[in-house]
Amino acid sequence: MEINREIKNITSAFVLEDNLTECIPYGSGHINDTYRLTYDTGKHYILQKMNKSIFTKPVELMENVSGVTAWLKKKIQENGGDVERETLNLVMTKDGLPYYVDEDGEYWRVYLFIENATCYDMVKDEEDFYQSAVAFGHFQRLLADYPAETLHETIVNFHNTVDRLDKFKTAVEKDVCHRAADVEKEIQFVLDRTELAHVLCDMQDQGKLPLRVTHNDTKLNNIMIDNATGKAICVIDLDTVMPGLSVNDFGDSIRFGASTGAEDEKDLTKVSCNLHLYEVYVKGFIEGCGGALTETELDMLPMGAILMTFECGMRFLTDYLEGDHYFKIHREGHNLDRCRTQFKLVKDMEEKLSRMKEIVNKYKQV
């Protein structure tokens, strides 16, 4: 990419070297515009333009990121780790802010580039899945005593399953696209699990599940893997860091990581929860947590997997009923296919729940 005046103006606002030699698009993310900067010193940085249409409160978001990364740096230093590789490091502007606002009102930020490490979009083998589990567990461990209530809720009610259920019922009632009659079976699947939707929210309200710092996008591609050792070194993409439940972060990883089928698989006979991969993740996650979670949190990990899968399927069905406005679709009925896949996974997990609990008990005793 040509280093135009706009890029020069933006980078000059940050505390960086003088001679920028290259600016190229970087990574496979779909939300923010991301570039890798190279300076004549050989040092690299990541420059990002934040997507305000998705993250409508960029200042609050950056306050979350700043607070969490500063905390992580302190913990990593105390543990004798490498702060430049084991957490994201924000570069401040010359005004002392973690972001710069350009003439068009766009928000930009700069991170140190983590050298000799890679993000993978797909799980190559179970070791990758295990490493991501260790990393997200370790993330919980390092942030266990962070005051989660001080974080901004940048996406309100993101994993409030009761709120999602209310929105679903409204979509069924309004039936703006006249699709409800064709999906009565799927609608009934949700209504039959009204009590399920309340389980984790009720436990949080009753103080049985503590508020934690949660990542809310616990995919493999948000983990940096060291090129030399193959070990996970850093959790990235902290834009959705918010107060939440640890079991939800765990559950979302299982939802897509331990499924035997693609998220939009039409042949539902191919869709189930792979208990071997589930066990791989449980082992890594509990190891990474290092005793940071409560007994109740550990006991509810299987329920987190079921509920996150149920919530996701319900969101796909809600979007289908409302006319496919939220999730991008690539064919007719795409959201319905996604919904059916998630519901098949829920049913399979419900049937395997006792085994899923046994696996957690096996590793929480270690």
Identify the residue ranges that each predicted region occupies.
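ATP-dependent phospho-/nucleotidyl transfer catalytic cores
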Residues: 24-28, 48-49, 55-59, 114-134, ...
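Protein kinase-like catalytic core scaffold
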Residues: 45, 86, 109, 212, ...
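Active-site Asp-x-Gly
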Residues: 56, 226-283, 290-293, 329-335
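Juxta-kinase regulatory segment immediately upstream of eukaryotic protein kinase catalytic domains
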Residues: 1-24
